[in-house]
Amino acid sequence: MANGVHVTTSKTAAPTRLLTQAAGERQTGALVVGGHPGGAVYVLEGRVIYAESPAAPGVGELLTSSGRLAARTWQNALDLGTSTARVGRLLVEQGHLTQGELELCVLGATYDAAYFALSAAAAPVEFRTGAAHWLGPVVHIDPGAINREVRRRIRLLDEIFPDPRVDTAAVSPVPRPPRERITLTALQWELLVHADGQRTPADLALLLGKAGYATVQELRRLAALGLLELPEVRTDSTEFVRLPRTRGSAVDAHRPVVRADGGPAVPVVSGAAPVAAAVAAPDATDPPDPALAEETGANGAVYRPPRLARRKPGAKLPKDLAGEAPPPAHPGTDEVLLKRIRTALRALR
Amino acid sequence: MAIPGAVGASIVDYTTGFPVATTGAAPNEDHEAAAAGTADVVQAATSRSLFVSAVPHDLLEDLIITTSGGYHLLRLVQTDFDSRLVLYVWLDRVQGNLAMARRRMQKLADELVAT
């Protein structure tokens, strides 16, 4: 069980390249990445089943620090399932977690840790053939998808605030905000409240049970807002009023925190609506309840643009409208589509 | 369970705009772009506009974008642990039933976690 992140004999290479290679050869084992923060990516016959990194809370930390599982429950599962690599399955079998929760949690934790393990352009890497993870296989992710996502996440951070020092240095809020009024998200507040000048982003992520990447992302946003001391400008002096120079370098007021444009516009569907996911929907057997019927009536007919509700809630429908509903059974998507989301969850990893 | 008029759907990590799972069609045949847009919209509603903090302990449930050709529904998936997922369903404007789709998406989002 090679769970440690200790590297014995290794060469320096691009971790993503080695992952691609291991996937191509359909290998089973652990890709152990050294350096800071480093981490390990576990593959089973070429598919990624889990990843861990000191900078990202693992499944256990996420589940216990959120209060979803009692620490004792988690420890019991570890004691029972570690030697046979089936901790994940045990938690579901014993009724502590649903399969859906476990999958979503493992999926999130894996992409999160993979970012930290694989984002270095070059690091000491080693492939330990045959190494398994005690969690056991819960998800199976295409390594190509992981590599692409790691690259995308690196880019996203740089779009927010291109200073990677924010990701690792001890978090230190500025003593005085650079403007009169600031707006914070809940996670940003949590981070600032718990930042004591000693804790690193990884410490905060573990402490709060938040994804490591989401933590770093919010910290970069805070840095962009000028609310964090950047490592370079930190001094040992206890001055409370910062010089304007500091503000200038830390605040980029013109930078939008989230990409405001460039994102895809909501598309206009042309006359022939896509029917790629056409599956028989037995809509006729499923009469809409009165509250829905007005909507249905309007939609069943030719589209009339600005049609606002003229009916009070609970009021009877006009006869002519009620008669139209339900619309002709549309070979729309349905249960099958929804099931396929679940199936797709499995198929995509 | 049926969502009449649904054209495509995906589950998106809204911190990163990553489509965790996709099915059916996507606007412009591009699930990744749709996911990135989904993330932007959720971020805008949660962190920039302050709709979600109008009432103490308020919680974002869903977002609905209406275009002349369709409805785009975003439903937050609530988990006890930190997950940040949103369910996105694209509905055809003529065939879709917004109220019904909204209720069924709620059920789907709950079932995703509860089963």
Predicted regions located by residue number:
Chain B
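Short N-terminal helix-loop-first-beta-strand/juxtamembrane motif that initiates sensory/input modules
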Residues: 2-15
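A generic fold-level signal
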Residues: 4, 57-58, 83
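Generic secondary-structure signature for well-ordered alpha-helical cores
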Residues: 5, 47-50, 110, 114
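A generic "binding-loop/recognition-motif" signal
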Residues: 15-16, 70
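A charged amphipathic helix-loop-strand protein-protein interaction module that recurs
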Residues: 26-75
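C-terminal binding/interaction regions
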Residues: 61, 67-115
